[in-house]
Design a protein with these regions (language model features):
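Active-site nucleotide-donor binding segment shared across nucleotidyl transfer reactions
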Residues: 27-59, 63-73
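Right-hand nucleic-acid polymerase module
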Residues: 102-105, 115-217
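Helical scaffold of the NTase/Pol beta-like nucleotidyltransferase catalytic core
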Residues: 1-40
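Conserved catalytic core of two-metal-ion nucleotidyltransferases
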Residues: 29-33, 77-132
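Alpha-helix boundary/N-cap detector
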Residues: 9, 13-16, 20, 74, ...
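Charged/polar, solvent-exposed surface patches and flexible loops
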Residues: 16, 20-27, 81, 85, ...
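Short glycine-rich, low-complexity/disordered patches
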Residues: 25-41, 92-107, 194-206, 215-217
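Short C-terminal domain-edge/linker segments immediately following a structured domain
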Residues: 68-74, 92-95, 153-161
């Protein structure tokens, strides 16, 4: 199996529903003293929703925490649980399943009664920025001995602070299709290796950096 890009017209309805859920999620989080913004991975450039063969369509979102009470920074389990509970509260239960806590994101499945054979995997990664401006992903180390079992940590995404500017430069030069193709190639490569340590945003940053340095260095 290998990933392929889903056409934008095909995914428009589902992006709209997911965006609505995440807008409500951010409103709920604000009432909990967490200020956050969400974005579809690769949004602002071109559609990067993928599908692995006949598997679920993948909608990958980043939820970037901009500001939060100190208690959340001191207790990352509390932060992730608060986001998960807000996401569950915001979801329309006739369409969405409850969010599951995976290693690097919250995952829920999206179903529609009029399209029973269509299933979407709706993944929400929790991010923030460090002092250097690079993104960091909230990771639940369920079985990583080096961190201690069942620990929560921030994991830096290298060379990610200016990924939007690099993507804009690539698009301006008419090279975005090459970046999209490389994104799909990398996702498929990691899939073939059964590598679960490279979620979509990490792969996106890798693809953008690779194409950027190929033409602009």
């Amino acid at each position: 199996m290998a990933y392929e890009i889903v056409c934008e017209s095909e995914s428009k309805r589902y992006r709209s529903d997911c965006a609505s859920v995440l807008t409500k999620t951010c409103e709920i989080l604000k009432s909990k003293n967490i200020i956050a913004q969400f974005s579809l991975v690769g949004s602002g450039a071109k559609n990067l929703i993928t599908r692995n063969g006949n598997g679920p369509y993948d909608l990958d979102y980043n939820l970037v925490v901009i500001k939060a009470d100190e208690r959340y920074w001191k207790d990352l389990r509390l932060l992730k649980d608060t986001v998960r509970n807000a996401l569950n509260k915001a979801e329309r239960k006739d369409f969405f399943s409850d969010a599951m806590d995976s290693r690097s994101c919250l995952t829920t499945l999206l179903h529609f009664n009029d399209s029973p054979n269509v299933e979407f995997s709706f993944d929400v990664a929790i991010l923030t920025k460090n002092r250097n401006g690079d993104y960091m992903r909230l990771i639940h180390n369920k079985n990583a001995f080096c961190f201690g079992y069942d620990q929560y940590t921030w994991n830096e995404v290298p060379k990610s602070h200016d990924v939007k500017e690099k993507a804009d430069a690539i698009k301006a030069e008419g090279l975005w299709q090459e970046a999209r193709d490389r994104y799909v190639e990398l996702k498929s490569m990691y899939l073939s290796r059964q590598d679960n340590t490279h979620p979509s945003f990490v792969v996106y940053v890798e693809a953008v950096n690779e194409i950027y340095y190929k033409y602009f260095r």
